[in-house]
Each structure stands twice: as C-alpha cells, then as structure tokens.
C-alpha cells in the first residue's frame, strides 16, 4: 500500500526547501512521505541549494506597493528572504517589483493551489465536468478531460504556476528558482493583496 502524499505534506516540504510543488511531491513519493529524507533527496538533486542554511528563517525581505493603470489597480506584496543584504540586492528588489506587476496584470487567486478556497475549486470542477459530459465520452476519458482543465485552471490562477508576463517561456516559480540559485537564499512570496477600483 502506498502512502498518500497530501497537499499539506507537499506545502510543508515546499516551505522548507522553496522547491516547486511537483518536485516536492515527487521527492515525497520517492521517500515514502518522509519529510527529512525528502529534503535530503532534493538537496542531492541540487534543487534545494538554499538548504545549506536549512535552519535559517526567511524573515527579511520587503513589502512593495505597485499602482497600475492610472490608479485603478493597486497591489501590496510581501516577499521574504533570509538576510538584509539579499533584501537590498538589485535582483531581489527587481523580482519583488516584477511579481507585483504580475499580480496586477493577471489577478491570481492564490500563490499556490492550496491557497484557493475549496468552494472555488469544486465549482470549477463541476463546471468542467458538466462541459465534458456533453461530449458523450466514457467516464475515464471525462476524468482526464476534467483533470486537464483543472491543471490549466491552476496554471492560470495560482501565482507560482502562471507564465511570467515578461518572459512567457518560464513560470513565476522558475523565476523564483533562478533568483534563489543566484543569491543562495530561501525566498518566499509570503502574501499579496490586489485592489481594483469598483470591485469587491
């Protein structure tokens, strides 16, 4: 019997290593859900380079405010890193500003899929299932169609999975990984809030 890898386990490993969700899930599957072994495995693969300071908290960083489109859209974002030195680096500051612009442009529902309310996810799934059922295809094909549409939904509505607007060949997660590798510190997009004139 294989252990089910839960979203909470993946999120926990991701917060420890700052490695992408799929790599975290794969590492947990390969280590039977053992968090410490999964951390070691990611380090061996070179994915968790910033883990050489595993005990260090990402408590530095910056909060940035971005106002777009003549004052009609505003974003507040908090991005954390481990040291004040990194927080003041040009690359880090540019990253925070670029991610704030991304949020303004794309209006994500969360940073990772787990941030999106279950109600929203279930509603999307129900809509996609109803659409798929109209095709008259067998149940196993319907499930694959729905899974494909849900994957696309998360790619469009979660910040880390979105294509980066300034370089659509990579995701925000790729951009974050590149910065993590170049400054050698854990970086976490902690939270954001997007405001649009006239919307709730």
Swiss-Prot record:
- Which Gene Ontology molecular function entries are recorded, alphabetically? translation elongation factor activity
Q: Which Pfam families match?
A: EF_TS
Q: Which organism is it from?
A: Syntrophobacter fumaroxidans (strain DSM 10017 / MPOB)
The record's section on Gene3D superfamilies has: 1.10.286.20, DNA helicase RuvA subunit, C-terminal domain, Elongation factor Ts, dimerisation domain
One Gene Ontology cellular component: cytoplasm
Function summary: Associates with the EF-Tu.GDP complex and induces the exchange of GDP to GTP. It remains bound to the aminoacyl-tRNA.EF-Tu.GTP complex up to the GTP hydrolysis stage on the ribosome.
Give the span(s) annotated as Involved in Mg(2+) ion dislocation from EF-Tu: 83-86
Q: Which CDD domains does the entry link to?
A: UBA_EF-Ts
- Protein's recorded name: Elongation factor Ts
């Amino acid at each position: 019997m294989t252990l089910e890898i839960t979203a909470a386990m993946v999120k926990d490993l991701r917060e420890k290593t700052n490695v992408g969700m799929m790599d975290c899930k794969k590492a947990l599957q390969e280590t039977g859900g053992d968090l410490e072994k999964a951390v070691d495995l990611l380090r061996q693969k070179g994915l968790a380079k910033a883990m050489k300071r595993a005990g260090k908290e990402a408590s530095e960083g910056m909060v940035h405010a971005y106002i777009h489109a003549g004052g009609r859209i505003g974003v507040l974002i908090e991005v954390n890193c481990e040291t004040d030195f990194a927080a003041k680096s040009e690359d880090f500051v540019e990253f925070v500003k670029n991610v704030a612009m991304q949020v303004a442009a794309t209006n994500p529902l969360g940073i990772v899929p787990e941030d999106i309310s279950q109600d929203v996810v279930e509603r999307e799934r129900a809509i996609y299932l109803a659409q798929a059922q109209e095709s008259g295809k067998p149940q196993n094909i319907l499930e694959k169609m729905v899974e494909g549409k849900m994957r696309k939904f998360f790619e469009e509505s979660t910040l880390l999975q979105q294509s980066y607007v300034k370089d659509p060949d990579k995701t925000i997660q790729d951009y974050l990984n590149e910065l993590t590798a170049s400054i050698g510190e854990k970086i976490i997009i902690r939270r954001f809030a997007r405001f649009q004139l006239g919307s709730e």
